[in-house]
């Protein structure tokens, strides 16, 4: 199933939200999320700092402020969440985002790009599908944007090497 114009708009919003965490989430990626019911935005969030709640949980809590993870108990049944990067499915400093999405009753997850981190890569999407959640991977320009957005994280997750930017200046005659 392809993305509608509204899906693309909301996924682009999630990518915009992710930028708010830039420079503060290392070693984690930057991630943004938007929760909707019947196409109406009811919650937004982004991953603010490493060790704190991930974007998906922040957005779910914004949508249902009276509850906290993992006590969502189906309160958002029928909701859709748009996420800039595949939800995590492993325990780290925080519980798996996939568990929070399932507990909240989210029925559709639209993802801009898969997570390259070996503990997550494809496993988050598979976990959601096994739970009966419809999963849509964007592809196209939004996926490319999401991959670029987390370029340094992708480099580290895939190769174990740092992302290095080298700036060099010289005069026209080749002197430094």
Regions found by a protein language model. Name each.
Residues 1-22, 41, 71-77, 92-176:
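Zinc-dependent deaminase
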Residues 46, 53-57, 81-100, 119:
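Local cysteine-cluster metal-coordination motifs and their immediate loop/turn environment
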Residues 16, 20-23, 47, 57, ...:
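Charged/polar positions on well-ordered alpha helices
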Residues 27-31, 53, 162-164:
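Short, basic and Ser/Thr-rich N-terminal targeting/leader segments
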Residues 30-39, 167-169:
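Short beta-strand scaffold segments in enzyme catalytic cores
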Residues 33, 41-62:
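N-terminal beta-alpha supersecondary unit
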Residues 60-91:
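Mobile, glycine- and charge-enriched loop segments
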């Amino acid at each position: 199933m392809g993305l509608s114009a509204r899906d693309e708009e909301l996924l682009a919003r999630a990518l915009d939200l992710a930028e708010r965490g830039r420079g503060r989430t290392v070693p984690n990626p930057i991630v943004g999320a938007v929760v909707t019911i019947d196409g109406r935005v009811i919650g937004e969030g982004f991953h603010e700092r490493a060790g704190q709640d991930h974007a998906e949980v922040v957005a779910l809590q914004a949508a249902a402020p009276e509850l906290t993870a993992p006590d969502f108990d189906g309160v958002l049944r029928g909701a859709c969440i748009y996420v800039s990067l595949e939800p995590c499915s492993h325990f780290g400093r925080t519980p798996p985002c996939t568990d929070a999405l399932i507990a909240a009753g989210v029925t559709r997850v639209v993802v801009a790009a898969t997570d390259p981190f070996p503990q997550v890569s494809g496993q988050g999407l598979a976990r959601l599908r096994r739970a009966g959640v419809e999963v849509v991977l964007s592809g196209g320009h939004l996926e490319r944007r999401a991959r670029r957005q987390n370029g340094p994280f992708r480099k580290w997750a895939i190769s174990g090497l740092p992302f290095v930017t080298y700036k060099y200046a010289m005069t026209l005659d080749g002197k430094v």
